[in-house]
UniProtKB/Swiss-Prot annotation:
GO biological process: transcription initiation at RNA polymerase II promoter
UniProt GO cellular component terms: chromatin; cytosol; nucleus; transcription factor TFIID complex
UniProt key word Signal: no
Gene3D superfamilies reported in the protein's UniProt record: Histone, subunit A
Annotated source species: Schizosaccharomyces pombe (strain 972 / ATCC 24843) (Fission yeast)
Entry keyword annotation includes Ribonucleoprotein: no
Keywords: Cytoplasm, Nucleus, Transcription, Transcription regulation
CDD domains recorded: HFD_SF
N-terminal signal peptide: none
Location in the cell: Cytoplasm; Nucleus
Alphabetized GO MF terms: protein heterodimerization activity; RNA polymerase II general transcription initiation factor activity
Matching InterPro entries: BTP, Histone-fold
UniProt-recorded name of the protein: Transcription initiation factor TFIID subunit 3
Amino acid sequence: MEETQIDELYFSLMRIFCSQTLRAAGIDRTKVSLLNSFTDITIRYIRLLSETAMAKAEVGRRSCCDLGDLRLAMEEIGLLNGSEEDVKTLVEWFNGPQVAELRRVSGFVQDSETQVKPKDWLTSLIQKQIRVSGPERFYETVFSASNEEEDVKDS
């Protein structure tokens, strides 16, 4: 693949992430130009954070950055102000339910008891249909027999 094709692929993947982020924030419609601008800003921000963290690692004569380098980079670009309260808030967020759900969805759950064997959508659909079959599947719908009786009584 050419360099431009790879860049376009990564941009498209990041645009999906950005659109999902906007949707999670309650914005369900946007212009394509705005989404592309938001994606570009996000890419530049992540690039700045990673380059700054890598520079901190190189100062320490390491080839890979660690959590301390990332924290210093966050302070340098203004994401954290260096206070202990900011760090506590960040640690609470990492230990919170949002990140736990992200780990579960991505398959990085460390506790083997909470891992569920994945099922494909067709198997799940078939099992759901097997559990609810016959007249019960129309319970509390417009097709249920109880609704027909109520309609007759109202007439």
